[in-house]
Regions:
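Active-site adenylate/phosphate-handling loop in enzymes that bind or generate adenylated species
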Residues: 1-50, 120, 126-149
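Adenosyl-5′-phosphate
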Residues: 2-4, 53-254
Length: 254
């Protein structure tokens, strides 16, 4: 059985939430560099991990060209050092590695969408869809990943036709309005992200995460910092992806 998938649309035509923020670059550049650096550093040091908007504030640093794409990171430099306090000899240079993988382009949105296409789509999205489809005997095809569409998106479609401050995937929306009938259901698509935050509201999942992360004396992560993440999640902060990443690592390490 052959099925069609929509993978590639967000990466090619600017469908992620932070893509809209990148269109605000000219506005952000009005803020003096020293003020942006102070705001970025202060948010990293003083705001608790998982605090809404903390990652975005960290992105307002001196070099918007390289810092904004890093706003989606789960573990910033400060948190990594705290979690790996017993491994101080490690070179924790994830920011440098990611900066080097950002494609060279004068347009910031074009750089970020290319980075997502080369890294996130290839190393994450397509891996999951391929595994889930094959285990169910499906041959999945992604029309957006046709070479002609890829070339068209990156070579001919300007950023303002992909994303603005007020909207995303504008070109695709215009095309669907022209091609699909008025009575066609145009509700937003439903993603397949794991509802981690909802899961962690239940005692069973929270206890399981707690046991995996704090139930062993052999963990490489600082137990006090891990407990802060767990407590922060209970207080409504957004730490579910961080905790899930730590749990998956510990299970793999065992």
């Amino acid at each position: 059985t052959v099925a069609l998938g929509g993978d590639g649309g967000d990466e090619l035509f600017g469908g992620y939430g932070y893509d809209r923020l990148l269109r605000m670059q000219k506005i952000l550049n009005i803020i003096p560099k020293s003020a942006r650096v102070l705001l970025s550093k202060s948010s990293e040091i003083f705001l608790p991990v998982g605090f809404k908007g903390r990652n975005y504030l960290q992105g307002f640093s001196a070099d918007l060209q390289t810092s904004l794409p890093l706003m989606t990171s789960f573990f910033d430099r400060t948190l990594r050092k705290k979690l790996l306090s017993g491994w101080s000899s490690l070179a924790l240079n994830a920011e440098y590695i990611r900066e080097q993988r950002v494609p060279n382009h004068t347009d910031l949105l074009q750089r970020v969408t290319r980075m997502d296409f080369k890294n996130f789509l290839a190393d994450d999205i397509l891996v999951k869809t391929d595994r889930s489809s094959m285990i169910n005997s499906l041959e999945l095809r992604s029309p957006f990943l046709d070479q002609h569409i890829i070339d068209f998106s990156f070579k001919r479609v300007p950023s303002h036709m992909k994303t603005t401050v007020s909207g995303r995937k504008l070109l695709l929306q215009q095309l669907t309005t022209r091609l699909l009938p008025e009575n066609f259901d145009q509700k937003r698509k439903q993603g397949f992200s794991i509802p981690l935050a909802i899961w962690l509201q239940s005692a069973g999942w929270r206890d399981y995460f707690h046991d995996v992360l704090l139930g062993s004396d052999n963990s490489i992560f600082d137990s006090k910092e891990v407990k802060k993440l767990l407590d922060g999640q209970d207080k409504g902060r957004s730490n579910s992806e961080r905790l899930f990443s730590l749990v998956m690592f510990e299970l793999w390490r065992e």
